[in-house]
Amino acid sequence: MFGYVDLYVLPVPKKLIPFYRRMSTKMGKMMRKHGCLEYREFLGNDLHVKKMVSPLTMVKVKKGEVLVFAVTGFRSKSHRNQVLKRTMADPAVKKMCQGSMPFDHKRMVYGGFSTIVKV
């Protein structure tokens, strides 16, 4: 387990999932190269639980979209900051970020979290 994680929740058009997976795989490899301890992404498939708030409401998922949840692991917040700085300075990442994205980044939920329980 990690001392610090970044969590991302974002809607992605179903038809763009193959493109999204290729792009995310490249980004994950770049983040790992620059020190990220783990990079994982998940596709939502059980998001309607009775008497609970659906994560679909967080980003107002539209028809034809699916919800992706991602987690990146780091030793600490300062380690995360160092990794992100190196990653974003990488010419390959800069080039990738200049292209079209398979999701609307303005609807992405993002935050950094410290571990409070480890069992």
Please state what every model-predicted region is.
Residues 1-25:
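Long, hydrophobic N-terminal alpha-helical segment
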Residues 4, 8, 20, 39-42, ...:
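Aromatic side chains
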Residues 5-12, 51-87:
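Short, well-ordered beta-strand segments in beta-rich or mixed alpha/beta enzyme
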Residues 9-10, 29, 100:
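Alpha-helical interaction segments
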Residues 17-19, 29-35:
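Short, well-structured hydrophobic secondary-structure segments
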Residues 18, 78-80, 118:
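Residue-level signal for secondary-structure boundary sites
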Residues 21-27, 83-91:
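Short amphipathic alpha-helices in soluble, non-transmembrane regions
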Residues 32, 36-63, 89-119:
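Glycine-rich beta-strand-turn "strand-cap" elements at beta-sheet edges
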